[in-house]
A protein has these predicted regions:
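Nucleotide-activated donor-binding/catalytic signature segment of Leloir-type glycosyltransferases, i.e.
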Residues: 185-207
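Short alpha-helical donor nucleotide-sugar binding micro-motif in glycosyltransferases
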Residues: 203, 211-216
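Carbohydrate-associated surface elements
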Residues: 100, 122
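Aromatic "clamp/platform" in nucleotide-sugar-dependent glycosyltransferases that forms part
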Residues: 224
Length: 238
């Protein structure tokens, strides 16, 4: 894949054209960090939501890529970061879900600290709570990988599983997420010869996830970076 990803830039222009036709009490953008948002900011109360700087995704993907052709494709795909680095410092009001993300935004995007407000994400403790009727499987590990990308760190969990199987043959890993067919993770699982010990679960309801946590003995969070790690508090709540 050698294409780019122009959507953040083009979305900004489309949003400005559409939103300029009406008056709004407030306009909130989620992570496009585009030139169009600066135009919107001039005429409207405006907030930019930045979950975390996508520069982290780029760095980890680049480090995990070996072939020159694939490295070039990563530079092209993440070319929108140049725009975001220019736009972000000019945004007056930014909301982010954690102090870790706030630090990342300051360091990576050179934003002013007083322009950033931290509002933690919440979790419904009634939806994610212990299920006393389910006995945890002593050999079941569980992790979440919302995307088949290096940032999620699934490689480390899989390699650790390979080592653990030598001492605990029954041990297995449940992954909440969908494996990309023919992708890096599938190839790694085959290379490690652990296909019979890794189970991917996707399209789950919140109750399904709750039951999987309840049936597991250890929850693994192997992400290399998270702006706000939902799997951590979900696992702790269950």
């Amino acid at each position: 894949m050698l294409g780019g990803f122009p959507e953040p830039k083009t979305f900004g222009y489309r949003a400005y054209k559409f939103l300029s036709k009406n008056n709004y009490d407030i306009i909130i953008d989620n992570q496009s960090i585009s030139h169009g948002m600066l135009k919107i900011q001039k005429n409207n109360p405006f907030i930019e939501i930045i979950h975390h700087p996508i520069t982290f995704d780029f760095k980890f993907e680049l480090a995990a890529t070996e072939k020159i052709k694939h490295k070039i494709s990563r530079y092209r795909w993440y070319s929108f970061l140049k725009m975001q680095k220019k736009v972000a410092p000019k945004i007056k009001n930014i909301i982010t879900p954690s102090h870790s993300s706030k630090k990342g935004i300051i360091d990576e995007f050179n934003c002013f600290e007083n322009a950033i407000t931290v509002i933690n994400n919440g979790l419904d403790a009634d939806e994610f709570s212990p299920i006393e009727s389910i006995t945890p499987n002593p050999f079941r590990l569980i992790t979440t990988a919302s995307a088949d990308v290096p940032l999620k760190g699934l490689d480390y969990s899989l390699k650790a599983l390979k080592l653990l199987k030598k001492e605990f043959p029954k041990i297995h890993l449940v992954v909440i997420g969908k494996m990309k067919e023919g992708g890096h993770t599938e190839r790694l699982i085959e290379r490690l010869n652990i296909s019979d010990s890794v189970f991917f679960k996707s399209n789950l309801s919140k109750n399904d996830i709750k039951e999987l946590y309840a049936s597991s003995s250890v929850a693994i969070v192997s992400s290399l970076y998270e702006g706000f790690g939902y799997p951590v508090i979900e696992a702790m709540s269950c």
